[in-house]
């Protein structure tokens, strides 16, 4: 589930300067008439390259770029790290959300979207200050976290269709 920020964020140059030690940053410039192609390329690169390395997408209000943030090797979790600590959503929380939203109040003001285009549209329309796109959590990652006896981070999965609660939780007596 993508994170969408409603609180102020630093100017792009300042923000990217904070991320440079931790992330390799690739900018995909937007120009008049090419947004749909650049957006498609942005999402495709996030999905394909993000399968092998921790990678996040970033869109900022009033900025003419999409950014791909690839976690540098030196900041990636080791093989001995817990399954929860190796999740993209945990890495995003540790390296990005903690920087952009240091207070609990700012984190509680965050919105969530399961749809890439919805999150990016909110930014382009000026409704929010930033969108952070993640790759979906894999079922194998959920199983690894559960097998280790850990809990999944908040809003880290989105499975559909969802079972109806009444069919699963309530005892039906005749």
Protein language model regions, located:
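Surface-exposed, charge/polar-rich loops and edge strands
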Residues: 1-174
């Amino acid at each position: 589930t993508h994170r969408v920020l409603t609180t102020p964020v630093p100017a792009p140059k300042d923000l990217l300067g904070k991320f440079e030690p931790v992330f390799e940053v690739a900018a995909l410039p937007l120009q008049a008439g090419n947004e749909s192609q650049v957006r498609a390329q942005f999402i495709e690169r996030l999905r394909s390259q993000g399968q092998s390395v921790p990678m996040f997408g970033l869109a900022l209000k009033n900025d003419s770029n999409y950014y791909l943030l690839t976690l540098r090797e030196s900041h990636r979790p080791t093989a001995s790290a817990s399954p929860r600590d190796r999740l993209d959503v945990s890495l995003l929380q540790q390296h990005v959300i903690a920087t952009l939203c240091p207070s609990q109040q700012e984190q509680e003001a965050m919105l969530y979207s399961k749809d890439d285009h919805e999150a990016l549209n909110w930014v382009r329309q000026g409704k929010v200050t930033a969108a952070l796109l993640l790759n979906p959590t894999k079922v194998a990652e959920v199983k690894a976290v559960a097998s280790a006896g850990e809990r999944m981070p908040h809003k880290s999965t989105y499975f559909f269709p969802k079972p109806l609660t009444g069919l699963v939780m309530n005892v039906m007596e005749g």
